[in-house]
A protein has these predicted regions:
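A broadly structural signal marking compact, well-ordered functional cores
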Residues: 1-10, 21
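Residues in the helix-turn-helix
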Residues: 150
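Conserved active-site tyrosine of GNAT-family acetyltransferases
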Residues: 17-22, 86, 114
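Conserved beta-strand-loop-alpha-helix junction that forms the acyl-donor binding cleft
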Residues: 8-14, 101
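Helix N-cap motif at beta-to-alpha junctions
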Residues: 13-14, 77-80
Length: 157
């Protein structure tokens, strides 16, 4: 049996990345092995030089930071407050808060090694916001594509 365990990001400076993920994003340390650090929730960071050595060396396995091959996705129920905090930090934005076609508001920015981080508004918050703007549960379902029963359960509570 195969079991998924973690996503691993290669980083230049373990301490700088720990400060970012723990301090800004609130990640909780699971294991610190020096060259490899794992956080609760399935994210790990690995020191570039050590990782390249495991893979056969930098000539065989070059690392390209900022290549935009993917992103790490997080959610918050306080997107505006988190965005204001980001503006106080020394982060480079991919973009400020934008609304996706399905109604969710998100912000994207870079970690210290230019991995893309997305912080999205929790979908439950999207439903409540849209409902307060006059959308019916059916209209929210059409816009978001989420199951109607889920939307109705959120709006009832």
């Amino acid at each position: 049996m195969i079991k998924y365990m973690t996503t691993l990001l290669v980083v230049e400076d373990i301490q700088r990345s720990r400060n970012f993920y723990e301090g800004l994003l609130g990640m909780k340390l699971q294991h610190d092995l020096g060259v490899n650090v794992s956080f609760e929730g399935g994210l790990a960071i690995h020191l570039k030089d050590h990782f390249q050595g495991l893979m056969g060396g930098p000539e065989r396995f070059p690392i390209v930071f900022g290549a935009h091959y993917g992103e790490l996705y997080f959610e918050t129920d306080e997107i505006e407050a988190f965005f204001q905090r980001l503006k106080q930090e020394d982060v480079a934005f991919v973009h400020e808060i934008v609304e996706q076609p399905w109604g969710q508001r998100v912000v994207r920015f870079y970690d210290p090694d230019r991995h893309v981080i997305e912080i999205g508004e929790q979908m439950e918050a999207v439903f409540v916001r849209m409902h307060s703007q006059g959308f019916t549960a059916q209209q929210i379902q059409q816009k978001t594509g989420m199951p109607l029963a889920f939307i109705e359960a959120v709006l009832i509570n």
